[in-house]
């Protein structure tokens, strides 16, 4: 055990950077490639359906079942062109991470064959088991289920062969079992209060959108070194060991050269950020070794 860290460090220095293939297209061409944004909605949905969906996204207007069926059909047509075979209601439970259950688009046709189908009913709501989430232990068996409901204000996106549908997740009793439900409630309350204030200066203000400022730094740790640190594994924080070198004493200063493995990671992150995270304005325009 006393030599574990030395062996891990030695192994880390021998690792080579991952090979990252740059897309043949320009960044502007694969921007939001795997996101069902408004441009793709306009292309794959009828005009009236597009208007109804954007109204639901912008103003929280309810969607009729027939409109949901049309939206689901358009989403499926776009997704299958990307090679998608499954869909999932994707949410962030109170137990951290993400939760998802992948279902295929296939249905029996009643004649011994199969057909690909994705209806508005499957898009809008599902009833997964909520037993493994903080849902209370004293309850009847039928109360173990939860409800996942599509949130039109967040973009649907594709990862690998799966269409990911952002949803909220609540218990049978209506209690929130995810992080998004309270966030949406908070945004609604902040927006309403902000509109009231803005109308003192401009009576025509109808809506105020709140944005979250993301932290700009991230830390990269070799997987082997990470596994050898119980404090990082259990808490995600450094709780033991020597203090880091300060005052730019080494060559890894504020404008230091970016290590090869780190540069490969940044390149891969840039590509995925443009393809997937572009609609929520997460991009990586700068490569910078921030050591301070």
Give residue spans per PLM region:
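N-terminal hydrophobic targeting/anchoring segments and the immediately downstream early-domain regions
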Residues: 2-24, 141-162
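Histidine/acidic residue-rich metal-binding segments in metalloenzymes
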Residues: 15-120, 124-140
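Aromatic/hydrophobic pocket-lining residues that form π-stacking "cages" and hydrophobic walls in ligand
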Residues: 52, 75, 194, 269, ...
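Short aromatic/hydrophobic-glycine micro-motifs
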Residues: 61, 84, 203, 278-279
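Short, surface-exposed recognition loops or helix-turn segments adjacent to catalytic cores
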Residues: 67-68, 211, 283
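ATP/Mg2+-dependent ligation/transfer catalytic cores
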Residues: 144-270, 277
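Generic recognition of long tandem-repeat/solenoid scaffolds
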Residues: 163-165, 289-292
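Residue-level detector of conserved catalytic or cofactor/ligand-binding positions
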Residues: 280-291
């Amino acid at each position: 055990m006393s030599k574990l860290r030395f062996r891990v460090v030695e192994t880390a220095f021998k690792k080579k950077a991952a090979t990252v293939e740059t897309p043949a297209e320009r960044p502007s061409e694969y921007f939001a490639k795997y996101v069902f944004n408004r441009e793709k909605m306009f292309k794959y949905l009828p005009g009236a359906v597009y208007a109804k969906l954007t109204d639901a996204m912008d103003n929280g207007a309810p969607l009729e079942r027939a409109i949901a069926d049309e939206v689901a059909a358009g989403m499926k047509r776009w997704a299958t062109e990307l090679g998608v075979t499954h869909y999932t209601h994707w949410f962030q439970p109170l137990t951290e991470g993400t939760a998802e259950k992948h279902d295929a688009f296939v249905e029996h046709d009643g004649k011994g064959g199969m057909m690909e189908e994705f209806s508005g009913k499957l898009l809008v709501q599902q009833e997964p088991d909520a037993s493994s989430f903080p849902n209370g232990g004293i309850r009847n068996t039928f109360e173990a289920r939860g409800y996942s409901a599509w949130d039109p204000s967040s973009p649907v996106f594709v990862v690998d062969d799966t269409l990911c549908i952002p949803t909220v997740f609540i218990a049978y009793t209506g209690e929130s079992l995810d992080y998004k439900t309270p966030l949406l409630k908070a945004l609604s309350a902040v927006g309403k209060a902000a509109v009231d204030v803005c109308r003192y200066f401009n009576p025509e203000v109808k809506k105020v959108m709140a944005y979250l400022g993301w932290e700009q730094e991230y830390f990269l740790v070799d997987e082997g070194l990470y596994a050898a640190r119980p404090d990082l594994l259990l808490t995600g924080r450094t709780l033991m060991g020597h203090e880091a070198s300060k005052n730019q004493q080494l060559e890894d200063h504020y404008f230091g050269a970016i290590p090869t493995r780190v540069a490969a990671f940044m390149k891969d992150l840039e590509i995925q950020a443009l393809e997937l995270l572009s609609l929520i304005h997460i991009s990586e325009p700068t490569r910078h070794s921030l050591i301070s």
